């Protein structure tokens, strides 16, 4: 009899251990106990639901109508937070203060989230994936990524970012993927990518790039993939690409390339490049329109002396200075840009540094005839797969489909507690235990 009583007590302890702390899930949500996971996706919530257990490590709130994030909404024990595809317009600067365990934060597809405070992500020392795609951002404040030394994946695509300040990514020493495509960037300065010594993939396609400083890619020694297609580049010196010793995949098509003497250094670099590259269709001069720069011969540049003829050097310098001086752009973070330099704010007045491209009027050259995309290098799409699985919880960076894809609904697996039946689940377990106890007695 004593042995039977011990068995009953053991069963009761096991049942109690399986019931989540705090008495259940928020209403209309699904919970999973180990690790504590709360899924409240696609329930039309206008605010963070109440009753999220304090020991929750993973919280999924995507596809709702949540508008604000405030301190106290989440527990510092959280490791993963998905809150993409909501209506977030404001994130209080202290919302994630003390979240030293947070590893993945998905704020993407919140199209009214147009500004971020510099300290929004301060202290997230374990964060390795940050999603800020499709957020309506037009600028990034200085220091917004400060201290994120563990970050490996940063998704900033499909915003309205027009320029990047020097050293904006300088603390991201472990970053491997930087997605900036689908923005409105028109220039890259000497310190834009400074500090990204471990960057593997840089996507800059579908911007409005027309000016690249000759040291823009200086620190990217480990870069293997660079996409610059569908921009407004007419010129890119080989010196810009020289530091990219690990480069394997390069796309330059869809730009209005000038294949005159200015293109000689790029042509020479392409002859030495052993990776895979797209075609580089010429738009000018007229005799070379439609030709591939890669397929030109040394004889095509026999009349070029040095990197460019003296006339071209003079014309290039004047064009850069004059057009940069005429371009008016007001930074949201400070005074207007220095008229002597076409990239972002600069202290004082100085002559423009050596650059790799010639800035042009954005509307001057149409890209319609710039050439077809190379068939061997299709447009890049992130290899996302739906990253939520109750059966095998992800231990490494999850892969996901594009954010515009229809979301796969999450089904409650065996053993999962749902808010609508929390009490009935506990009652059923207790009834079963008591019945077994009666049988044993």
Swiss-Prot record:
Annotated region described as Disordered, given as residue ranges: 304-382, 397-417
Ranges of Polar residues composition bias in the record: 355-366
Segments annotated as LRR repeats: 55-76, 77-98, 101-123, 126-147, 150-171, 174-195, 198-219, 222-243
GO biological process annotation, one example: axon regeneration
Residues annotated as domain LRRNT: 25-54
Main location: membrane
Cleaved propeptide residues: 421-441
Pfam families reported for this sequence: LRR_8
Regions of compositional bias (Basic residues) in chain numbering: 326-353, 397-409
Alphabetized GO MF terms: chondroitin sulfate binding; heparin binding; signaling receptor activity
Ranges where the LRRCT domain occurs: 255-306
A GO-annotated cellular component: extracellular space
Covalently attached lipid (GPI-anchor amidated serine), positions: 420
Record localization: Cell membrane; Membrane raft; Perikaryon; Cell projection
SMART domains recorded: LRR_TYP, LRRCT
Transmembrane segments: none
Family, as annotated: Belongs to the Nogo receptor family.
Function: Cell surface receptor. Plays a functionally redundant role in postnatal brain development and in regulating axon regeneration in the adult central nervous system. Contributes to normal axon migration across the brain midline and normal formation of the corpus callosum. Protects motoneurons against apoptosis; protection against apoptosis is probably mediated by MAG. Plays a role in inhibiting neurite outgrowth and axon regeneration via its binding to neuronal chondroitin sulfate proteoglycans. Binds heparin.
Record's protein name: Reticulon-4 receptor-like 1
Species this chain originates from: Homo sapiens (Human)
Gene that specifies this protein: RTN4RL1
């Amino acid at each position: 009899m004593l042995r039977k009583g011990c068995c009953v007590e053991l069963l009761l302890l096991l049942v109690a251990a399986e019931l989540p702390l705090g008495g259940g899930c928020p209403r209309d949500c699904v919970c999973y106990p180990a690790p504590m996971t709360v899924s409240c996706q696609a329930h039309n919530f206008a605010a963070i639901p109440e009753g999220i257990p304090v020991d929750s490590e993973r919280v999924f709130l995507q596809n709702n109508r949540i508008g604000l994030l405030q301190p106290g909404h989440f527990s510092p024990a959280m490791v993963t937070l998905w809150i993409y595809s909501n209506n977030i317009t404001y994130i209080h600067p202290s919302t994630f203060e003390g979240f030293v365990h947070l590893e993945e934060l998905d704020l993407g597809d919140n199209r009214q989230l147009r500004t971020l405070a510099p300290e929004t992500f301060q202290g997230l020392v374990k964060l390795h994936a940050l999603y800020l795609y499709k957020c309506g951002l037009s600028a990034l404040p200085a220091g917004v990524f400060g201290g994120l030394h563990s970050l490996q994946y940063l998704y900033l695509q499909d915003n309205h970012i027009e320029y990047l300040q020097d050293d904006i990514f300088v603390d991201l020493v472990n970053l491997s993927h930087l997605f900036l495509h689908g923005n409105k960037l028109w220039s890259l300065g000497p310190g834009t990518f400074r500090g990204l010594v471990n960057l593997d993939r840089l996507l800059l396609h579908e911007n409005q790039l027309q000016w690249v400083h000759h040291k823009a890619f200086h620190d990217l020694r480990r870069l293997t993939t660079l996409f610059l297609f569908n921009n407004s580049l007419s010129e890119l010196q080989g010196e810009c690409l020289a530091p990219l010793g690990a480069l394997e995949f390069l796309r330059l098509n869809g730009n209005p390339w000038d294949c005159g003497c200015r293109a000689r250094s790029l042509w020479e670099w392409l002859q030495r490049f052993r990776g895979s590259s797209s075609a580089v269709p010429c738009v000018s001069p007229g005799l070379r329109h439609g030709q591939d720069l890669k397929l030109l011969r040394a004889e095509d540049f026999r009349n070029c002396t040095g990197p460019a003829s003296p006339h071209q050097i003079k014309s290039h310098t004047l064009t850069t200075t004059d057009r940069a001086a005429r371009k008016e752009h007001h930074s949201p973070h400070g005074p207007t840009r220095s008229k002597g330099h076409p990239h972002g704010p600069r202290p004082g007045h100085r002559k423009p540094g050596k650059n790799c491209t010639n800035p042009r009027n954005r509307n001057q050259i149409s890209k319609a005839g710039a050439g077809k995309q190379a068939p061997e290098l299709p447009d890049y799409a992130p290899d996302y797969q739906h990253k939520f699985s109750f059966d095998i919880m992800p231990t490494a960076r999850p892969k996901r489909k594009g954010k515009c894809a229809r979301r796969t609904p999450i089904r409650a697996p065996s053993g999962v507690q749902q808010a609508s039946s929390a009490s009935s689940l506990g009652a059923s377990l207790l009834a079963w235990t008591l019945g077994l106890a009666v049988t044993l007695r």
